[in-house]
A protein has these predicted regions:
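Conserved N-terminal segment of class I S-adenosyl-L-methionine
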Residues: 1-114, 137, 164-195, 199-213
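A conserved beta-strand element that flanks and buttresses the S-adenosyl-L-methionine
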Residues: 122
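Hydrophobic adenine-recognition pocket in adenosine-nucleotide-binding enzymes
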Residues: 126
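Histidine-centered divalent metal-coordination motifs
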Residues: 129
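A short glycine-rich, Lys/Arg-flanked "PGG" loop and its adjoining helix->strand segment in the class I
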Residues: 134-148
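Conserved class I S-adenosyl-L-methionine
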Residues: 149-171
Length: 213
């Protein structure tokens, strides 16, 4: 299943292709490498509580809630019918979902959590969609006391791959909703201003970082 999701405020939140549940063998191979690196970095962070910003339909937060047992896991995302439908299907006793206030069209407002409320704050395939990624990362760092775990598409590779498969030619291969584009080096530079980049992984075609605060 795929499509373009637009929030109630008219914000394109991206292509909603279900990469975690895809039956395509190529996608499955790419996602296996992605999830392996993600699991390894999550284990290195060893959190007892997690905030996932832009949690989507709840695939990852449900997994993390099961892994943490009684540890608190909170997923937050925009109000959108398909997202909340996913939340209804993915529940756990220690898992909580919150609807994010979109605020003005040019930025995402402050996260509704206290300073150092979580061990880990994550944004997995999210920062490319937000109008002000610097503000979003700053808010994540405020809410987390130990680590950030983040991933984004690696550019210009991502757009080149889109064009190679004949997708989004009119946008030069840019996926709908992708407002920001980072090479591995430029993404490391962005996150380095918020903490020590402890691990950098490059599962094709993404960049994934674990940042120590």
């Amino acid at each position: 299943m795929s499509g373009v999701t637009v929030s109630g405020d008219g914000i394109v939140t991206g292509n909603t292709y279900d990469k975690y549940g895809s039956s395509n063998p190529v996608v499955r191979r790419l996602m296996a490498a992605f999830e392996r690196d993600l699991d390894e970095l999550f284990d290195l962070a060893a959190p007892s509580s997690v905030l996932d910003v832009g949690c989507g339909e709840g695939v990852l937060v449900q997994r993390w809630a099961e892994r943490l047992g009684e540890g608190r896991v909170v997923g937050i995302d925009l109000e959108e019918e398909s997202i909340q439908a996913g939340w209804a299907e993915r529940q756990a006793p220690n898992l909580e979902y919150r609807v994010m206030e979109a605020g003005r069209a040019d930025r995402v407002e402050n996260l509704p959590f206290a300073e150092d409320e979580f061990d880990l704050a994550s944004a997995i395939e999210v920062l490319e969609h937000v109008p002000d990624p610097e503000h979003t990362v700053s808010e994540m760092a405020r809410c987390a006391r130990r680590h950030l775990l983040v991933s984004v598409p690696r550019e210009p590779l991502w757009r080149m791959l889109n064009m190679a498969r004949g997708a989004y030619w009119s946008a030069l291969g840019n996926t709908p909703g992708h407002l920001n584009h980072w090479s591995r080096r430029s993404f490391v530079k962005l996150l380095s201003s918020h903490g020590d980049v402890a691990e950098v992984r490059s599962p094709f075609p993404w960049t994934m970082l674990l940042v120590r605060l």
